[in-house]
């Protein structure tokens, strides 16, 4: 065999091999590579989206926590205000009750004083009548009258 023919046959075989590889093997291989690249790109995009979603979720969590703290502080402030209102109402109620008790006591004191005055008037009138009787029974004498009046004054 001639060397030219051998080179030509090998060139033809090589060309056939290139054609078979280019038509039968290369397209599925390129398709597999492209699919793999696409999957990798999708994975990277998903990772980026996940990181963004995580960052957004973290921001939202921080915002919700901030709102919760604000609301908790508002609730605590409202509770303190309500407690102060209740304390003030209790103080006012206690003052009103004390005033009412004071008025009742004052009314009772006034009534007792009035009864005591009436009792004193009765006793004074009895003493006056008794003194008048004694004066009328004795002779009219200035010294005796003075002694009787002093005695009445001591009794009063």
UniProtKB/Swiss-Prot annotation:
Gene3D superfamilies: 6.10.250.1580. Signal peptide: none annotated. InterPro entries: ATP_synth_B-like_membr_sf (IPR028987), ATP_synth_b/b'su_bac/chlpt (IPR002146), ATP_synth_F0_bsu_bac (IPR005864), ATP_synthase_B_chain (IPR050059). GO terms for cellular component: plasma membrane; proton-transporting ATP synthase complex. GO terms for molecular function: proton-transporting ATP synthase activity, rotational mechanism; proton-transporting ATPase activity, rotational mechanism. The keyword Transmembrane applies. It is a single-pass membrane protein. It comes from the Bacteria. Belongs to the ATPase B chain family. F-type ATPases have 2 components, F(1) - the catalytic core - and F(0) - the membrane proton channel. F(1) has five subunits: alpha(3), beta(3), gamma(1), delta(1), epsilon(1). F(0) has three main subunits: a(1), b(2) and c(10-14). The alpha and beta chains form an alternating ring which encloses part of the gamma chain. F(1) is attached to F(0) by a central stalk formed by the gamma and epsilon chains, while a peripheral stalk is formed by the delta and b chains. F(1)F(0) ATP synthase produces ATP from ADP in the presence of a proton or sodium gradient. F-type ATPases consist of two structural domains, F(1) containing the extramembraneous catalytic core and F(0) containing the membrane proton channel, linked together by a central stalk and a peripheral stalk. During catalysis, ATP synthesis in the catalytic domain of F(1) is coupled via a rotary mechanism of the central stalk subunits to proton translocation. HAMAP family: ATP_synth_b_bprime. This is ATP synthase subunit b. It comes from Xanthomonas oryzae pv. oryzae (strain KACC10331 / KXO85).
């Amino acid at each position: 065999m001639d060397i030219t023919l051998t080179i030509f046959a090998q060139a033809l075989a090589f060309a056939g091999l290139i054609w078979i590889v280019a038509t039968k093997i290369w397209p599925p291989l390129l398709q597999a590579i492209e699919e793999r690249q696409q999957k990798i790109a999708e994975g990277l995009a998903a990772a980026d989206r996940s990181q963004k979603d995580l960052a957004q979720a973290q921001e939202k969590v921080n915002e919700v926590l901030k709102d919760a703290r604000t609301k908790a502080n508002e609730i605590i402030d409202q509770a303190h205000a309500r407690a102060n209102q209740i304390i003030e109402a209790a103080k006012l109620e206690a003052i009103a009750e004390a005033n009412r008790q004071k008025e009742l006591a004052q009314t009772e004191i006034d009534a007792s004083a009035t009864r005591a005055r009436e009792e004193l008037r009765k006793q004074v009138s009895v003493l006056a009548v008794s003194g008048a009787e004694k004066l009328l029974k004795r002779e009219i004498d200035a010294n005796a009258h003075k002694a009787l009046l002093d005695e009445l004054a001591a009794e009063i």
